[in-house]
Regions:
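Catalytic, metal-anchored helix/loop core of enzyme active sites in primary metabolism
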Residues: 1, 218-220, 243, 339-349
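ATP/NTP phosphate-donor binding region
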Residues: 1-86
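Active-site segments that bind and position negatively charged phosphate/pyrophosphate groups
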Residues: 187, 191-300
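A glycine/threonine-rich phosphate-anchoring loop and its flanking beta-alpha core
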Residues: 101-193
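C-terminal charged capping/lid subdomain of soluble metabolic enzymes
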Residues: 173, 275-349
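Generic secondary-structure signature for well-ordered alpha-helical cores
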Residues: 81, 147-150, 156-163, 171-183, ...
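Short glycine/serine/threonine-rich phosphate/pyrophosphate-binding segments
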Residues: 94-101, 122, 238
Length: 349
């Protein structure tokens, strides 16, 4: 069944409508400790949720693991969930990823609705059917493709976010601009993230979601063009896992932004991406995201992490690169020297 994405101007009305189209002998609402405090109050008095069962998990990506997943399964079981129950995931990407995985595996699958509350989840995590958890220090190592019945996007939740979380989600929007068209990219690399115009941002969010929807609809299980969405993610996931391993975790969008620096450099070297556009994009990222401190001694660990990437085939590290804005080159390979050169550029500029 095709996932429906609703850009909502009236959250209660649209949630009631979505619930009415789903089986629901019982309703469970999954939040983490942060969204329970900041976002649950915005919907807790909705009549449709008056008899719901709340499930609250610990916040942050470090808890996106088997232990937390088991807690959710146990809460569903203790709450009397059946195959006809409904779970609503209210939160950022950690909640929608883990909650979607829990729902899609409990009793072989129950319906779920995603209400993303972070910019990152609105434009990326909650749309497209990817669910999962981290395992063995690796990002999203275990998971399944499973569409929520509905994704309800309501930008009122953006006022709960700090600047870092706005920037984190914006990195995925920048990626969507790079794989889309020049007009979208040009608007994104000139947007003032320090003083965001929320009306403009809301319009850009809707456009960004449409970019991802078009790609996912064409290739739901990532056999071809959906790999375009992996721009920045081969290096980005390595940066993210590396930071997690050394006990200094970074937000996913920051990791993707750093990954785009290396992969745009690789695009300029290998697939003729225009150097002026590379430098303009890299300058925007450096000004808004800072950097991740790495040394040459870290390169073997980072490359080892890239070897674990799910996009790889036969032990060869695969990248999504660009020939130009909107000119996507999937299944690109690079040897270790080329990767080290890109890491040098990331580190030294």
């Amino acid at each position: 069944m095709k996932q429906k994405v609703v850009i909502s101007g009236n959250l209660e009305r649209d949630l009631v409508s979505a619930i009415s189209e789903c089986e629901h002998d019982r309703i469970f609402v999954l939040t983490d400790e942060t969204t329970q405090q900041l976002c649950w109050p915005k919907i807790k008095n909705f009549k449709a949720l008056k008899d719901c069962t709340p499930i609250i998990i610990k916040a942050t990506d470090t808890h996106k693991n088997l232990d937390t997943l088991a807690e959710v399964w146990q809460a569903l079981s203790n709450g009397g969930a059946t195959r006809h129950s409904l779970m609503i995931n209210l939160g950022g990407g950690m909640v929608t990823d883990l909650g979607g995985f829990a729902a899609s595996t409990f009793k072989r699958g129950i319906d779920f609705i995603n209400i993303p509350t972070t910019l990152l989840a609105m434009v990326d995590a909650s749309v497209g059917g990817k669910t999962g958890i981290n395992f063995g220090g690796l990002k999203n190592e275990i998971g399944v493709f499973s569409d929520s019945r509905f994704v309800i996007i309501n930008t009122q939740f953006l006022d709960t976010l700090d600047h870092d979380n706005i920037c984190s989600g914006y990195a995925e929007m920048l990626k969507h601009g790079l794989i889309s068209d020049e007009r979208t990219w040009a608007e994104l690399v000139t947007f003032d993230l320090d003083n965001p115009d929320l009306n403009q941002l809301q319009r850009m969010v809707a456009e960004s979601i449409k970019v991802k929807e078009r790609i996912v609809e064409t290739d739901p299980h990532e056999h071809g063009i959906r790999k375009a969405l992996n721009l920045g993610h081969t290096m980005g996931h390595a940066f993210e896992s590396f930071a997690m391993r050394r006990g200094t975790p970074i937000l996913h969008g920051y990791a993707v932004a750093y990954g785009m620096i290396g992969e745009l450099y690789m695009s300029a070297r290998k697939t003729a991406f225009p150097t002026d556009r590379m430098h303009q994009t890299v300058r925007f990222i450096r000004e808004n995201y800072g950097t991740l401190n790495i040394t040459c001694d870290d390169y073997p660990t980072l490359i080892e992490l890239m070897h674990h990437d799910k996009k790889n085939t036969s032990g060869i590290i695969n990248f999504t690169l660009l020939g130009n804005v909107g000119d996507i080159r999937i299944n690109q390979t690079a040897n270790e020297e080329e990767i080290k050169e890109a890491l040098d550029f990331f580190r030294e500029g």
